[in-house]
């Protein structure tokens, strides 16, 4: 007989439970109680025999509260590991274990009740013993445990195995919408949109909580239009996604369903409508940094900088000080908006806070960003320190040398600017920036001949700014 699926396993006691494909079988009866000590027992071998090996229970040690591990006075024949141990009523009391040595006068058996108690649970999909065999695993009989298996299985089994699990789930729980929803997600990913649509309609049909089914359909539609809009399917659109979210809210008003509508409206570039919905959610149980951040994006798209800033302030205010890393992305976003609004010193404050939180991951681009804010805020020494750090982290990026030389010229550090510009030229001799700032610093220092020569080189390389300086210093 072929094994259909595993129903459980225990490596410690070396037992497994499985289902077989068989049209007709006569099962043995499992004894309802443990065999007592001194009870007579018989070993039923795999092959038919006229007489059964007989023994006596010498010891019945209890494990896991009510199961017995038997020591039996019985010389165990070869090839009878896992064979049933029977009582005088013909019931199975145990399963034979591997003997310590051949021809030993004592043998061992584990309770048949224990073997029968093995079952598949929601997390059994990750059980090392079950995973060591490639035999198919059964789904749990309880719906909540089977759903847990599906959830965990998304990340722990290959796609073919997962699809097979889904089919088994739908066959066992045909009135549960979850199986159809999961299968629709897979079909959508495979661009089988008609199949996905059928599954979601079935999910809605069988669902007791139809609002949840409509909401799940809305999420699938939104993800498809967001990530696969180039693959047209006439029945699906963002309008359809919005319709499903609104139907979910009609059936059972919940903030999460309104939030879904806001997300879709934003994708449709209906920013004012989305912003209004977000505003209605600020005092709901969805209130969070992410909610305020999403709302701020609506204001940004509407060119409402003040509104965007206010929402980012609310976003950051959801975190207590001292901040944890979770606040870092939002602080950085606010810094970018402050920088764009020419509020340089406030931007620097946010960038300082971000650096403290993300010290191990900040890169050269971060220090260049803060350099720009510091230059705008006239924090020149801090700016020079940051551009030096950017150069240390990305020493072959000529832009940083050019920016450093530019600032050095601005603050009167002419000798330093000349050295920095020469480094820039060494790294990128075909770029104009190094020659421009070298020439400018030299002219400011009184070395007009060399300075004009370098300014003209910058002009040859396409820098139109050089013309202004050439004209200025030629006529002096």
Located regions from the model:
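Canonical tetratricopeptide repeat
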Residues: 182, 216, 260, 294, ...
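Helix-start (N-cap) detector for alpha-helical repeat units in TPR-like alpha-solenoids
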Residues: 177-178, 210-215, 253-258, 288-290, ...
């Amino acid at each position: 007989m072929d094994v259909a699926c595993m129903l459980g396993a225990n490596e410690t006691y070396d037992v497994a439970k499985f289902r077989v494909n068989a049209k007709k079988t006569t099962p043995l009866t499992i004894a309802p109680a443990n065999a007592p000590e001194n009870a007579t027992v018989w070993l039923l071998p795999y092959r038919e025999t006229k007489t059964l090996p007989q023994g006596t229970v010498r010891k019945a040690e209890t494990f896991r509260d009510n199961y017995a591990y038997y020591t039996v006075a019985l010389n165990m024949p070869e090839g009878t590991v896992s064979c049933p141990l029977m009582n005088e009523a013909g019931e199975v009391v145990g399963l034979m274990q591997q003997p310590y040595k051949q021809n030993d006068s004592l043998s061992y058996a584990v309770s048949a009740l224990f073997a029968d108690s093995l079952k598949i649970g929601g997390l059994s999909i990750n059980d090392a013993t079950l995973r060591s065999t490639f035999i198919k695993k059964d789904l749990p009989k309880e719906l909540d445990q089977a759903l847990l298996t599906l959830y965990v299985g998304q990340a722990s089994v290959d796609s073919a195995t997962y699809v097979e699990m889904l089919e088994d789930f739908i066959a066992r729980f045909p009135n549960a919408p979850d199986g159809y929803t999961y299968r629709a997600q897979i079909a959508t990913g495979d661009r089988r949109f008609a199949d996905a649509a059928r599954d979601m309609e079935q999910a809605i049909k069988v669902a007791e909580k139809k609002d949840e089914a409509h909401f799940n359909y809305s999420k699938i539609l939104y993800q498809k239009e967001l990530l696969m809009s180039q693959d047209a399917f006439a029945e699906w659109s963002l309008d359809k996604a919005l319709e499903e979210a609104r139907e979910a809210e009609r059936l059972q008003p919940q903030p999460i369903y309104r939030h879904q509508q806001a997300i879709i409206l934003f994708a449709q570039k209906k920013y004012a409508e989305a912003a209004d919905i977000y505003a209605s959610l600020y005092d709901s149980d969805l209130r969070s940094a992410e909610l305020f951040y999403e709302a701020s994006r609506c204001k940004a798209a509407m060119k409402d900088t003040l509104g965007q800033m206010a929402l980012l302030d609310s976003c950051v205010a959801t975190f207590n000080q001292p901040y944890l890393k979770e606040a870092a992305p939002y602080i950085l976003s606010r810094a970018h908006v402050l920088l764009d609004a020419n509020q340089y010193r406030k931007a620097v404050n946010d960038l300082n806070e971000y650096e403290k939180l993300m010290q191990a991951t900040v890169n050269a681009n971060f220090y260049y960003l803060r350099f720009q804010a510091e230059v705008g805020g006239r924090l020149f020494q801090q700016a020079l320190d940051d551009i030096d750090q950017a150069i240390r982290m990305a020493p072959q990026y000529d832009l940083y040398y050019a920016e450093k030389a530019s600032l050095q010229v601005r603050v009167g550090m002419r000798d330093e600017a000349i050295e920095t510009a020469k480094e820039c030229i060494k790294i990128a001799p075909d770029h104009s920036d190094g020659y421009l700032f070298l020439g400018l610093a030299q002219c400011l220092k009184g070395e007009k001949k060399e300075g004009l020569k370098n300014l003209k080189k910058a002009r040859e390389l396409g820098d139109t700014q050089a013309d202004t300086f050439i004209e200025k210093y030629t006529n002096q």
